[in-house]
From Swiss-Prot:
GO terms for biological process: coenzyme A biosynthetic process. It catalyses: (R)-pantothenate + ATP = (R)-4'-phosphopantothenate + ADP + H(+). Keywords: ATP-binding, Coenzyme A biosynthesis, Cytoplasm, Kinase, Metal-binding, Nucleotide-binding, Potassium, Transferase. Coiled coil: none annotated. It is an enzyme of class 2 (transferase). The gene is coaX. Its cofactor is NH4(+); K(+). GO terms for cellular component: cytoplasm. Catalyzes the phosphorylation of pantothenate (Pan), the first step in CoA biosynthesis. It holds the Pfam family Pan_kinase. ATP binds at D6, I7, G8, N9, S10, R11, I12, K13, T131. Substrate binds at Y94, G101, I102, D103, R104, T183. This is Type III pantothenate kinase. K(+) binds at D128.
Length: 266
């Protein structure tokens, strides 16, 4: 079995590769003290895993913990992916392509794979609403035009608590309203409407530049909160990064099989 793993800043998502697509998806919140205990509980029923293909934006410490866990339990090493200058019909906008977040690169890979035929005549705006909110644009010819990053809904209140006197991080239930009557609700609503305004304005400006030929895709844990307030019609793809992982894992599986056959023939 090939296991696809998407490690974010707050959650870990996974799926098995089935016919080139992600299947049997699961997710857990990352533990504050590490991920080994979380993985032992979440993956205890998995058997016959021979490859683990990983998109990690959670940092080197969590990567090291995953390596240790996989070696201890399954005696295999993870395959950490990085963004490329080009591939899968995409040309990376970054002069140092490997510095583009792997989650953003795989989002580009996934939408390029998903939209074919007539849909390929339009550019695609991809919004990922996670710990950070990212917006990337992929031209119809596969050229990545670049993107933007702002703090996500959970990060904005933390920033205010860290840098503003009189505002503390709250443990109250998250509340959203147009005009709030408590400080915590005002912060949460401000974060939400700020994110919506950012996405709407940037997507509008990009659409003008593209002369209206633009499709919209949204993903990430906070997408369900943001999506209802957006002006444009977005396709919600919660498993976008896993779709990109599946595409790359399928491609590299073919290369590995061909290499094994070549070695066997020698």
């Amino acid at each position: 079995m090939i296991l696809l793993v998407d490690i974010g800043n707050s959650r870990i998502k996974w799926a098995r590769l089935d016919g080139g697509k992600p299947a049997d998806m699961g997710a857990v919140t990352r533990g504050k003290t590490g991920i080994k205990r979380v993985l032992s509980k979440a993956w205890k029923e998995f058997g016959d895993v021979n490859r683990v293909v990983v998109a990690n934006v959670g940092g080197p410490k969590v990567a090291e913990q995953l390596e240790q866990w996989l070696q201890t339990h399954w005696q295999i090493a993870p395959e950490f992916l990085t963004a490329r200058s080009n591939g899968y019909g995409i040309r990376n906008a970054y002069s140092k392509p490997e510095t583009l977040g792997i989650d953003r690169w795989l989002g580009l890979v996934a939408v390029r794979q998903r939209y074919r035929g007539g849909d390929r005549k339009k550019a695609i705006c991809i919004v990922d609403c996670g710990t950070a909110i990212t917006l990337d644009v992929l031209a119809a010819d596969g050229k990545h035009l670049g993107g933007l990053i702002i703090p996500g809904l959970a990060m904005m209140p933390k920033f205010l608590a860290d840098h503003t006197a009189g505002i503390n991080e709250t443990t109250e239930a998250v509340e959203y309203s147009l005009l709030a009557s408590t400080t915590s609700a005002a912060i949460n609503a401000g974060a939400l409407y700020g994110a919506v305004a950012f996405i709407d304005r940037v997507s509008h400006d990009v659409a003008v530049e593209m002369k209206g030929e633009l499709k919209f895709v949204i993903t990430g844990g906070d997408a369900p909160r943001i999506l209802p307030l957006l002006r444009d019609k977005y396709e919600h793809l919660p498993d976008l990064v896993l779709r990109g992982l599946a595409r790359v894992a399928k491609d590299t599986s073919k290369v590995r099989r061909e290499t094994d056959l070549d070695c066997a023939a020698q």
